[in-house]
C-alpha cells in the first residue's frame, strides 16, 4: 500500500498544494465491515477480497488563493482534478506490481465519513479496490482520435 501511495504523491498538484488524502482499509475484517456499511451491494460483490482505498482532498486550497478566493470559475474542481492525477498514478503503479484496481464512485459519503473519521474540510472522491480480478471483462470500445481531437 505504501508503494501505491508513494507513486500517487508524485503526481503534480495545483501550486504544489498536495491536498490529496488517502484512507486505506487493508485487514479483511476492516474491509468487510467498511464494505457492508459504505458500499452498495453490487460494489461489495465487485470488490470482494480486495483492499480498499478511499480518496479525498482538502477543499478550498487547490484552485484557491491564500485568502480563500477561487483563482477561477473551477474552484474545488481543481482539487478533484489533482485527485484524479494522483489516483491515476496509484492505479498505474498497482498495475506495474501485478495488481488490479476498480474505481467505485457509487458509495455512501456520510457512512464513509463516519467510519473513517474524515473531517468536513475534506471532499471525498472514489473508493478504489486493489487486489486481483476474478473476471476479465471485455475492454469497452474507445472513440477514435478524430472523435475527440480538434486541430486548429
Where are these regions (language model features)?
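Structural motif
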Residues: 51-53, 101, 123-125
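Short proline/glycine-enriched turn/loop segments at secondary-structure junctions
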Residues: 114-120, 137-140
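Short, hinge-like loop/turn segments at secondary-structure boundaries
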Residues: 41, 119-122
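C-terminal helix-cap and adjacent tail motif
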Residues: 66, 126-152
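Short secondary-structure boundary segments
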Residues: 58, 106, 132
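A short N-terminal beta-strand-loop micro-motif at the entrance of redox/enzyme domains
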Residues: 1-3
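Small-aliphatic-rich amphipathic alpha-helix that forms the alpha element of a beta-alpha
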Residues: 8-9, 54, 71-115
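Glycine/small-residue-rich phosphate/adenosyl-binding loop
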Residues: 6, 10-83
Amino acid at each position: 500500500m505504501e508503494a501505491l501511495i508513494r507513486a500517487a504523491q508524485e503526481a503534480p498538484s495545483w501550486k504544489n498544494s498536495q491536498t490529496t488524502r488517502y484512507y486505506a482499509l487493508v485487514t479483511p475484517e476492516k474491509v468487510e465491515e467498511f464494505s457492508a456499511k459504505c458500499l452498495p451491494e453490487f460494489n461489495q460483490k465487485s470488490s470482494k477480497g480486495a483492499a480498499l482505498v478511499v480518496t479525498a482532498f482538502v477543499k478550498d486550497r487547490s484552485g484557491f488563493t491564500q485568502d480563500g478566493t477561487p483563482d477561477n470559475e473551477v474552484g474545488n474542481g481543481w482539487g478533484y482534478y489533482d485527485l484524479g492525477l494522483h489516483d491515476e498514478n496509484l492505479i498505474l503503479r498497482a498495475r506495474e506490481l501485478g495488481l488490479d484496481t476498480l474505481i467505485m464512485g457509487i458509495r455512501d459519503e456520510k457512512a464513509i465519513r463516519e467510519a473513517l473519521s474524515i473531517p468536513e474540510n475534506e471532499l471525498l472522491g472514489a473508493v478504489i479496490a486493489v487486489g486481483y480480478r476474478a473476471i476479465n471483462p471485455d475492454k469497452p470500445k474507445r472513440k477514435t482520435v478524430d472523435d475527440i481531437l480538434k486541430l486548429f
